[in-house]
């Protein structure tokens, strides 16, 4: 891909080392890649990982039980994910997530995803145009 998961890991690590309480909900074991309870990647010292559970259910579980400042997950797309993000952001926690789409205009064409945009303060579009992880745009208004 364009480096979305790698960027997520780096953001998690940076936030954790700045003493934010970070919870990663890793439905498909791609962000943390746990092995015997340890991440294959450096995700920082104050990061909790919930792996192998439904994304929406997992986000709400960590919200209730871990009191995170930030919840991180990948590949948002189902209505239940969007509903969970709404509950999380209404509770005061932040969400950092990835979504597949060429650009913001493509995302805005889907009514369910368009509704989700109001829960985010920043949207970054990545590509591989100048190598994996190329930041094409960083938007604070859409």
What is each PLM-predicted segment?
Residues 1-15:
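Glycine-rich phosphate-binding P-loop
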Residues 16-62:
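P-loop NTPase switch/communication element
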Residues 20-21, 44-47, 67-70, 91-97:
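Loop/turn-to-beta-strand initiation segments
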Residues 24-25, 70-74, 94-100, 125:
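Structural recognition of the conserved hydrophobic beta-strand(s) that form the central parallel beta-sheet
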Residues 34, 104-116:
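Glycine-rich, charge-decorated loop segments at or immediately adjacent to ligand/cofactor-binding or catalytic sites
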Residues 62-72, 76:
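Proline-aspartate-enriched helix->loop->beta-strand connector
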Residues 83-87:
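A short acidic, amphipathic alpha-helical/loop segment
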Residues 118, 122-142:
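Conserved P-loop NTPase
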């Amino acid at each position: 891909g364009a480096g979305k998961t790698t960027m997520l890991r780096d953001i998690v690590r940076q936030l954790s080392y700045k003493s934010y309480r970070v919870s990663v909900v890793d439905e498909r074991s791609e962000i943390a890649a746990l092995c015997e309870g340890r991440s294959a990647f450096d995700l920082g010292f104050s990061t909790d990982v919930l792996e192998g559970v439904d994304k929406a259910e997992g986000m709400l579980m960590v919200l209730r039980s871990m009191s995170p400042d930030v919840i991180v997950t990948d590949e948002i797309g189902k209505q239940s994910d969007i509903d969970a993000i709404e509950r999380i952001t209404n509770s005061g926690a932040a969400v950092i997530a990835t979504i597949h789409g060429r650009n913001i205009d493509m995302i805005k064409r889907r009514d369910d995803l368009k509704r989700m945009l109001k829960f985010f303060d920043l949207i970054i579009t990545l590509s591989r145009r100048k190598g994996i992880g190329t930041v094409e745009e960083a938007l604070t208004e859409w």
